From Swiss-Prot:
It comes from the Bacteria. One of its GO terms (molecular function) is structural constituent of ribosome. Belongs to the universal ribosomal protein uS8 family. One of the primary rRNA binding proteins, it binds directly to 16S rRNA central domain where it helps coordinate assembly of the platform of the 30S subunit. One of its GO terms (cellular component) is ribonucleoprotein complex. It holds the Pfam family Ribosomal_S8. This is Small ribosomal subunit protein uS8. It comes from Desulfovibrio desulfuricans (strain ATCC 27774 / DSM 6949 / MB). InterPro entries: Ribosomal_uS8, Ribosomal_uS8_CS, Ribosomal_uS8_sf. Transmembrane segments: none annotated. The keyword Ribonucleoprotein applies.
Length: 126
């Protein structure tokens, strides 16, 4: 049993990118579906396909190099990190995104700031 499924998902994406794989499969959960949807919406992955028990994420490359250059898990099961709406960090001076779990669902940092909601800072992607 995994203690941190979100970190496992990010690690699978990172490892698949380093191995230049076309797609990666991760076990399905609603939180991971929301994370994958945000990655697709922000242009970090090509496509997201949800099946009964897993999520297939088609990775995106630009001239043979991965679009995602870094992934970082912020809030962990042992150390939760919460931020208010006005304390949402800018990632890589605006070149990346942060993903939060809020009362309005899982949102990227810009959307959470526009809606003026804070929450648990899940990860940063650049």
């Amino acid at each position: 049993m995994l203690t941190d499924p979100i970190a496992d998902m990010l690690t699978r994406i990172r490892n698949a990118h380093l191995a230049l794989h076309k797609e990666v499969n991760v076990p399905r959960s609603r939180m991971k579906e929301s994370l994958a949807a945000i990655l697709k919406q922000e242009g970090y992955v090509e496509d997201v396909a949800v099946a009964d028990s897993n999520i297939t994420i088609t990775l995106k490359y630009l001239k043979g190099k991965p679009v995602i250059s870094g992934l970082k898990r912020i809030s962990t099961p042992g150390r939760r990190v919460y931020v208010g709406a006005h304390k949402i960090p800018r990632v890589q001076n605006g070149l990346g995104i942060c993903i939060l779990s809020t009362s309005s669902g899982v949102l990227d940092g810009m959307t959470a700031h526009e809606k003026k909601v804070g929450g648990e800072l899940l990860c940063e992607i650049w």
